[in-house]
Amino acid sequence: MALNNFLFAQCVCYFLAFLFSFVVVVPLSENGHDFRGRCLLFTEGMWLSANLTMQGRERFTVQEWGPPAACRFSLLASLLSLLLAAAHAWRTLFFLCKGHEGSFFYAFLNLLVSAFVVFLVFIASTIVSVGFTMWCDTITEKGSTPHSCEEFQETDLELNVDNSAFYHQFAIAQFGLWASWLAWLAITTLAFLKVYHNYRQEDLLDSLVHEKELLLARPTSRTSFQGEKSAVI
């Protein structure tokens, strides 16, 4: 019963990781298409007036687009999380239906993979959160403009890109990444508990085998001692 509960908890966590990763992949892919391969994260720019005699900000000019590697890394990390979560969810569901338990090697390998994904998704989450905050600070000039970052997606920035949904896309991506990270953190914790349980179980089995050998050796020792005593008499 305990094994089934443990496998069910793992299966639920894998399903959540798959779901949240899917939530990340879709908006990031859409944003890459809308921005024609340009990366919004860490983009530098400023507002310029078309006529220096006029007051107010009329046109946003990008000085340097963000590094494409930032968006690609976040998308690839989400795809890797999606595929691994799907594969492990299927395997765990198979174990749950059959009532089987994985080997110690599989549990240890699962721990390593889960820890690696936790690290990878954490980096991707940080990149997206920090990069998107820098973009919003740039177009709002750190809050000095009359419009918020979300409101600017309703304004044509004239950057030769489709910026009509960038805020919602990255808001959803941020939520999905951090939620996926929490799901993988729970998976890693369960994997560690599984490895620790298997390690303690193997120690217990070794102790039982050792005690059995000692018990089997005691009658032999008593018999030899009685034989020596009879010979002396």
Swiss-Prot record:
- The regions listed as transmembrane in this protein's record are 6-26, 75-95, 104-124, 170-190
Q: Which InterPro entries match?
A: TMEM179 (IPR029673)
Q: How does it sit in the membrane?
A: Multi-pass membrane protein
Question: Where are glycans found on this sequence?
Answer: N51
Keyword annotations for this protein, in alphabetical order, are: Glycoprotein, Membrane, Transmembrane, Transmembrane helix
Q: Where in the cell is it found?
A: Membrane
Q: List the record's Gene Ontology CC terms alphabetically.
A: membrane
Where would one find the signal peptide in this protein? none
Highest taxon in the source lineage: Eukaryota
Say which family it is in: Belongs to the TMEM179 family.
Its name, as the record gives it, is Transmembrane protein 179
Tell me what organism the protein belongs to. Answer: Mus musculus (Mouse)
Top-level taxonomy:
Eukaryota, Metazoa, Chordata, Craniata, Vertebrata
**Gene from which this protein is expressed:** Tmem179
